[in-house]
A protein has these predicted regions:
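Bacterial N-terminal signal peptides that target proteins for export
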Residues: 2-14
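Bacterial N-terminal signal peptides
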Residues: 12-22
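PEST-like low-complexity, intrinsically disordered acidic/proline/serine-rich tracts
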Residues: 26-316
């Protein structure tokens, strides 16, 4: 009994000490949260704030800003408002729409950032660490695109010589309630369906902002090879809880039997002036360039020569 009494005495002796040691830990956390709230900076409550905007779920695209991209598509030779440099313009002018029928390209997924403007629904899924319960990554999934991981755990981007893919390598962080995504290591691919292209040196920054059931994505394409200035676009999605992504098996078929790769040599594309002649837009303006993005360019267009209008040829 004497040993039992001594053990009880030790427990009662150390219990107040343990309580005293544990109080500062809780009070420090509470004080940090309180200071962050009072300062309005969110310091001390970062984990709470980073989970306050949840992007997970099913979304459907509302192409209010990009109707041109999902209708018949922009015309050949129409680069108005695109900051193409000389190399980017030459690359775009070699485009032949017949390339979409090439077997090697039929099943290629839409690249970042074009996939935001693809038709159909999108799903955003959270990858959560099962032990720490911290957010490891968001995954975006589209009808005809690969699973895109957007890492949230602070991992660095790989070195320049790492493989480039259609979805690239994406990391993200929160700025307030906005999710800011940085993507590198992309393959060269299209940023518009009529020829304008981004190189494999491109860096894409995206801002995701949620307002209730609406999600706005702003993309900032910075390409030192093909663009004079960054190309900025936006698109809106709406949350739709009853939407489900359909199964999309891609089957390669012989759509265009040819022994040539569809393309035009520089200066040999005969369709570049068609848009200008049919729409009454100065041909010089249709060549694009950074200055065509700004409202002031309209005044310059007034002094440009416009070719006589030619009627659009009938398809029947």
């Amino acid at each position: 009994m004497g040993e039992v009494n001594r053990a009880k005495s030790i427990v009662f002796l150390f219990l107040p000490v343990m309580l005293l040691l544990s109080i500062p830990a809780f009070s420090q956390q509470g004080n940090a949260i309180e200071r962050g709230l009072q300062a309005g900076t969110g310091a001390g409550v970062e984990q709470v704030l980073t989970q306050s905007t949840d992007f997970a779920g099913e979304w459907v695209v509302r192409n209010w800003q990009n109707r041109l991209e999902r209708s018949a598509g922009p015309s050949l030779g129409d680069y108005l408002g695109m900051p193409l440099n000389a190399a980017g313009r030459m690359r775009a002018e070699t485009f032949d729409a017949g390339e979409w029928s090439v077997r090697d390209l039929q099943c290629r997924p839409h690249p970042v950032p074009y996939q935001w403007r693809a038709q159909g629904a999108m799903r955003i899924v959270k990858e959560v660490d099962p032990v720490s319960r911290e957010l490891v990554a968001y995954h975006t999934q589209y009808v005809r695109s690969l699973d895109r991981a957007i890492y949230m755990d602070g991992r660095p981007h790989p070195p320049d010589y790492a493989p480039h893919t259609w979805e690239g390598f994406s990391t993200a962080h929160f700025e307030g309630n906005d999710l800011v995504i940085t993507t590198t290591h992309l393959k060269e691919s299209y940023i518009r369906r009529n020829g304008p292209t981004m190189s494999d040196q491109v860096k894409v920054t995206e801002w995701l902002t949620r307002h209730g059931d609406y999600l706005t994505i702003v993309t900032y394409i910075d390409d030192p090879v093909y663009l004079e200035e960054p190309f900025i676009q936006s698109v809106t999605y709406q949350r739709e809880a009853h939407t489900e992504l359909e199964y999309f098996p891609c089957t390669i078929v012989n759509e265009n039997i040819s022994d040539k790769i569809p393309h035009f040599l520089p200066g040999k594309n005969p369709w570049l002036k068609e848009f200008s002649e049919q729409e009454g837009v100065p041909y010089e303006a249709t060549r694009g360039g950074a200055e065509t993005m700004y409202p002031e360019y309209r005044a310059k267009m007034k002094g440009m020569k416009v070719a006589p209008l030619k009627p659009t040829p009938s398809a029947f």
